[in-house]
């Protein structure tokens, strides 16, 4: 690889996800000021030279995003199915170029779809309505969680949103231990992308999906439930509400879904047997 190209790639992967722009405040429309705004760029996931999906995302931690997306969409079963990965600039955004095993690439080609996604959209561009809600193996019941430990985690979720603290424009997804401690998290302008980044990182580091839960700062859509279940997550906590389809998918795949998570409050939609209070 040429030095100039390598330097360009390093610059791309070291982006902070924040850009300063000129803007005006309501109380002073005569004088512009600089403020931080979250970056949102098109990110294409390219498998073995073929573009599979374009998502709008924050330009950070894209390797984790690509790995998490590949796992949560059933493209791969393990990080070992990916032989290599590079993040490179393209004409209008970024590409994550992924080298899949031959077996996985053949499977991908059989069900290939092209998405032109809105921000973190998990449905845009599916070829048929039947493609929505892929079958998920029912989850086992291997753990419990004390809801009294949730409040402390909620207080620290913002720690994983440095861009969000500057801009007010990102979602977070974090892993919560049974003690309530958050031991890793990611943020993104797209809630699904933030979750994929978390799933990708934990898989890359070989962490177990047992003994813990996912906590997200957003609502719980069916895609969030499905992605979590595809990776073996048994419990999903969301700060906002759940949709009807999210509840249906969670019920079907044995995932414990909890919404409206605030200090002293939580609404359990499915499988409360994993929870105590």
Swiss-Prot record:
GO terms for cellular component: cytosol. It is found in: Cytoplasm. Belongs to the FdhD family. Keywords: Cytoplasm, Molybdenum cofactor biosynthesis. Mo-bis(molybdopterin guanine dinucleotide) binds at residues 260-265. Its main location: cytoplasm. Required for formate dehydrogenase (FDH) activity. Acts as a sulfur carrier protein that transfers sulfur from IscS to the molybdenum cofactor prior to its insertion into FDH. Specifically interacts with IscS and stimulates its cysteine desulfurase activity. Also binds the molybdenum cofactor. Required for activity of formate dehydrogenase N (FDH-N), formate dehydrogenase O (FDH-O) and formate dehydrogenase H (FDH-H). The active site is at 121 (cysteine persulfide intermediate). One of its GO terms (biological process) is Mo-molybdopterin cofactor biosynthetic process. The gene is fdhD. Homodimer. Interacts with IscS. One of its GO terms (molecular function) is molybdopterin cofactor binding. Changing residue 240 to D: Strongly impairs FDH activity. Induction: Repressed by aerobiosis. This is Sulfur carrier protein FdhD. It comes from the Bacteria. Disruption phenotype: Mutants lack FDH-N activity and exhibit defects in FDH-H activity. It comes from Escherichia coli (strain K12). The keyword Aminoacyl-tRNA synthetase does not apply. Changing residue 124 to A: Does not affect sulfur transfer from IscS, but abolishes FDH-H activity. PANTHER family: FORMATE DEHYDROGENASE, SULFUR CARRIER PROTEIN FDHD. The keyword Nucleotidyltransferase does not apply.
């Amino acid at each position: 690889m040429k030095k100039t190209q390598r330097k360009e790639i390093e610059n791309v992967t070291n982006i902070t996800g924040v850009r300063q722009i000129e803007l005006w405040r309501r109380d002073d429309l005569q004088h512009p000021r600089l403020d931080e705004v979250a970056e949102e760029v098109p990110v294409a996931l390219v498998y073995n030279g073929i573009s599979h999906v374009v998502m709008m995302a924050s330009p950070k931690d894209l390797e984790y995003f690509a790995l998490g997306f590949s796992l949560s969409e059933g493209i791969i079963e393990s990080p070992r199915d990916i032989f290599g990965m590079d993040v490179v600039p393209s004409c209008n955004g970024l590409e994550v170029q992924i080298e899949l095993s031959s077996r996985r690439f053949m499977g991908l080609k059989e069900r290939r779809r092209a998405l032109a996604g809105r921000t973190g959209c998990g449905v845009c561009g599916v070829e048929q309505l039947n493609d929505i809600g892929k079958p998920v193996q029912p989850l086992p019941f291997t753990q419990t969680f004390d809801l009294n430990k949730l409040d402390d985690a909620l207080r620290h979720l913002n720690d994983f949103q440095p861009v969000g603290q500057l801009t007010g424009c990102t979602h977070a997804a974090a892993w919560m231990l049974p003690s309530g401690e958050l031991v890793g998290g990611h943020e993104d302008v797209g809630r699904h992308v933030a979750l994929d980044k978390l799933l990708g990182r934990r898989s890359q580091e070989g962490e177990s999906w047992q003994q813990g839960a996912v906590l997200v700062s957003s609502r719980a859509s069916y895609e969030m439930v499905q992605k979590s279940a595809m990776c073996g997550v048994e419990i999903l906590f969301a700060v906002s509400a759940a949709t009807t389809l999210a509840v249906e998918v969670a019920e079907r795949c044995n995932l414990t879904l909890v919404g409206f998570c605030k200090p002293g409050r939580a609404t359990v939609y499915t499988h409360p047997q994993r929870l105590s209070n």
